A protein has these predicted regions:
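Conserved hydrophobic/amphipathic alpha-helical signal-anchor segments
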Residues: 1-120, 130-132, 137-158
Length: 158
């Protein structure tokens, strides 16, 4: 180790439903809404890069706190703070990408579902031939049959 330097170890959260919900919760706290897309928003950009741009314009308490905590930090300090703070958001992105990779038929409706939509599907993925896991707009989750999912998705705003 070099004198005068500190090594910061950042542990990645697991790529699972719980991490995705934590990341979605943080997104709402930062932006007061869900992002329109989780992946490719725009193409070849990470979700947290897009979020950082949106946070600059946001006046939610959590966004204001983050901006205040970044004041006076060195460039390296800002980078570390952002990585640690935004880790749950990267978790949403990684989990969704894993669902795509594993061919779990995921879908995300952040463009039309809000945190107030307690009965609307925000995100879903296949867990078996006849069942899907659903995260609703208020971030509660449950397993539903594919028939129930079809009803829920038919009720989404157009």
């Amino acid at each position: 180790m070099l004198d005068g330097y500190t090594i910061k170890v950042v542990k990645l959260p697991p790529d699972n439903e719980e991490t995705a919900i934590q990341g979605l919760k943080l997104l709402v706290e930062l932006l007061d809404r869900y992002p329109e897309n989780i992946i490719d928003s725009p193409p070849r950009r990470h979700l947290d890069e897009t979020v950082l741009e949106l946070v600059e314009k946001s006046e939610t308490p959590v966004a204001m706190q983050l901006k205040e905590e970044l004041k006076g930090l060195t460039e390296g300090g800002i980078a570390i703070k952002r990585v640690v703070f935004l880790m749950p958001i990267r978790g949403v992105e990684r989990f969704y990408f894993l669902l795509i990779q594993d061919k779990k038929d995921p879908a995300y409706y952040g463009k039309i579902v809000t945190p107030k939509d307690t009965d609307k599907v925000l995100m879903r993925w296949k867990v078996s031939d006849n069942e899907y896991r659903v995260i609703y707009g208020d971030l509660h989750a449950e397993t539903v049959t594919k028939e129930k999912l079809a009803e829920l998705e038919a009720a989404l705003p157009k």
